[in-house]
UniProtKB/Swiss-Prot annotation:
Region (Lipid-binding), start-end ranges: 66-97
Signal peptide: 1-18
Name of the protein in question: Apolipoprotein C-III
The organism's taxonomic lineage, starting at the top: Eukaryota, Metazoa, Chordata, Craniata, Vertebrata
GO CC annotations on file: chylomicron; intermediate-density lipoprotein particle; spherical high-density lipoprotein particle; very-low-density lipoprotein particle
Length: 97
C-alpha cells in the first residue's frame, strides 16, 4: 500500500472515532440535562403537594379552633347567665333597722 492510502485510512479512522466520542459525549450531556430537569420537576411537584397538605392541615386546625371558640363562647354565655343569677340571689340585702 502506498503511504498516502495508509495516512488517509488512519485519518478516517480517527475522524470516525472522534465523531463517535462526540456523539456519546453529547448523549451524556443530554441525558444529564434530562435527569436534572426531571429531578427539578419532581422536587417542585413534591414541594407543591407538601404545601397543599400543609395548607389543608392549617385549615383543619383553624376550623377546629374556630369551632372550639364558638363552643366556648356558647358555654360561657350559658354559665355566665347562671352565675349572674346565682350571685344576685346570694347577695346579702342591706340591714333594715
Amino acid at each position: 500500500m502506498q503511504p498516502r492510502v495508509l495516512l488517509i485510512a488512519a485519518l478516517l479512522a480517527l475522524l470516525a472515532t472522534a465523531a463517535e466520542d462526540k456523539d456519546a459525549s453529547l448523549l451524556d450531556v443530554v441525558q444529564g440535562y434530562m435527569q436534572q430537569a426531571s429531578k427539578t420537576a419532581k422536587d417542585t411537584l413534591t414541594s407543591m403537594q407538601e404545601s397543599q397538605v400543609a395548607q389543608q392541615a392549617r385549615d383543619w386546625v383553624n376550623d377546629g379552633l374556630s369551632s372550639l371558640k364558638d363552643y366556648w363562647g356558647k358555654l360561657k354565655g350559658k354559665f355566665s347567665s347562671f352565675w349572674d343569677s346565682t350571685f344576685e340571689d346570694t347577695t346579702p340585702s342591706p340591714a333594715v333597722a
